[in-house]
From Swiss-Prot:
Keyword set includes Cell cycle: no
Gene Ontology annotations for the cellular component aspect, listed alphabetically: extracellular region
Predominant subcellular localization, coarse grouping: secreted
Signal peptide range in chain numbering: none
Name of protein: Pyrokinin-1
Compartment(s) where it occurs, according to its Swiss-Prot or TrEMBL record: Secreted
Annotated function: Mediates visceral muscle contractile activity (myotropic activity).
Highest taxon of source: Eukaryota
Keywords noted in UniProt: Amidation, Neuropeptide, Secreted
One record GO biological process: neuropeptide signaling pathway
Organism: Carausius morosus (Indian stick insect)
Amino acid sequence: DEGGTQYTPRL
């Protein structure tokens, strides 16, 4: 992903 901030936020 794009750092996990655009499509699926990595929390």
